[in-house]
């Protein structure tokens, strides 16, 4: 099965991806990591789409998406999970990632992008701040075991 974990920077996507990986066993591919699959971007996209399509009914694969243009790579049958966080939490996490400094232009960029995924269609919505990751991952595992 393919799990698309979708959300803004610092919303909790990678943490959730690791939890799901541990619960069901899966490969994680983040953002444009698929570019390593080939020398050219166009060839890498083709190979990655094939990998995703074969994973829909095969081995588990988690694709972590933080840019809207990456959504087109997800197969129609993928499980789509939106991970969200409030803007203050996102800024604080980003500040930590940047060693305690959040320049004003970066803060403005985060504010501008906030909510960019909210209107999409998702199978699940997970709160990356207050969500119970253990319970969520266990629920996915139970559904995976029934497949």
Predicted regions: what is each one?
Residues 14:
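Walker A/P-loop
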Residues 9:
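The conserved Walker
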Residues 5:
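Hydrophobic anchor at the beta1->P-loop junction of P-loop NTPases
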Residues 57-63:
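Loop/turn-to-beta-strand initiation segments
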Residues 17-57:
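Conserved substrate/cofactor phosphate-moiety recognition/catalytic segment
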Residues 76-96:
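Conserved phosphate-donor/acceptor-positioning beta-strand/loop module used by diverse small-molecule
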Residues 99-147:
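Small-molecule kinase domains that catalyze NTP-dependent phosphoryl transfer to phosphate-bearing small molecules
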Residues 1-2:
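Pre-Walker A (Motif I) flank of P-loop NTPase domains
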């Amino acid at each position: 099965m393919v799990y698309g974990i979708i959300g803004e920077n610092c919303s909790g996507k990678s943490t959730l991806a690791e939890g799901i990986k541990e619960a069901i066993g899966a490969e994680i591919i983040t953002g444009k990591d698929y570019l390593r699959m080939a020398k050219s971007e166009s060839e890498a996209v083709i190979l990655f789409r094939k990998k995703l399509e074969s994973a829909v009914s095969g081995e588990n694969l988690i694709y972590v998406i933080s840019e809207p243009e990456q959504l087109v790579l997800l197969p129609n049958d993928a499980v789509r999970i939106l991970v969200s966080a409030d803007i203050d939490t996102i800024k604080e996490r980003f500040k930590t990632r940047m060693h305690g400094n959040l320049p004003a232009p970066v803060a403005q960029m985060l504010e501008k992008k906030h909510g960019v995924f909210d209107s999409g269609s998702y199978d699940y919505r997970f709160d990356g701040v207050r969500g119970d990751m253990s319970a969520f991952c266990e629920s996915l595992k139970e559904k995976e075991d029934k497949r």
